């Protein structure tokens, strides 16, 4: 038994329902992060960039 930790990980019986719920939760977390962090930050940066471009043309 060279890798006891590996054997512990392989011997754990995880139901497919638990794995599916975990995957759905992870995807939900990614979508929430995109909605609350990435989209507003990108929108703000685009707005600042466009505002700066308009001010340079004057």
Curated annotation (Swiss-Prot):
<keyword id="KW-0793">Thylakoid</keyword>
<dbReference type="InterPro" id="IPR023428">
    <property type="entry name" value="PSII_PsbX_type_2_subfam"/>
</dbReference>
<dbReference type="GO" id="GO:0015979">
    <property type="term" value="P:photosynthesis"/>
</dbReference>
<comment type="similarity">
    <text>Belongs to the PsbX family. Type 2 subfamily.</text>
</comment>
<feature type="transmembrane region" description="Helical">
    <location>
        <begin position="27"/>
        <end position="47"/>
    </location>
</feature>
<keyword id="KW-0602">Photosynthesis</keyword>
<keyword id="KW-0604">Photosystem II</keyword>
<comment type="function">
    <text>Involved in the binding and/or turnover of quinones at the Q(B) site of Photosystem II.</text>
</comment>
<keyword id="KW-0472">Membrane</keyword>
<comment type="subunit">
    <text>PSII consists of a core antenna complex that captures photons, and an electron transfer chain that converts photonic excitation into a charge separation. PSII forms dimeric complexes.</text>
</comment>
<dbReference type="Pfam" id="PF06596">
    <property type="entry name" value="PsbX"/>
</dbReference>
<dbReference type="GO" id="GO:0009523">
    <property type="term" value="C:photosystem II"/>
</dbReference>
<dbReference type="GO" id="GO:0031676">
    <property type="term" value="C:plasma membrane-derived thylakoid membrane"/>
</dbReference>
<keyword id="KW-0812">Transmembrane</keyword>
<keyword id="KW-1133">Transmembrane helix</keyword>
<protein>
    <recommendedName>
        <fullName>Photosystem II reaction center X protein</fullName>
    </recommendedName>
</protein>
<dbReference type="InterPro" id="IPR009518">
    <property type="entry name" value="PSII_PsbX"/>
</dbReference>
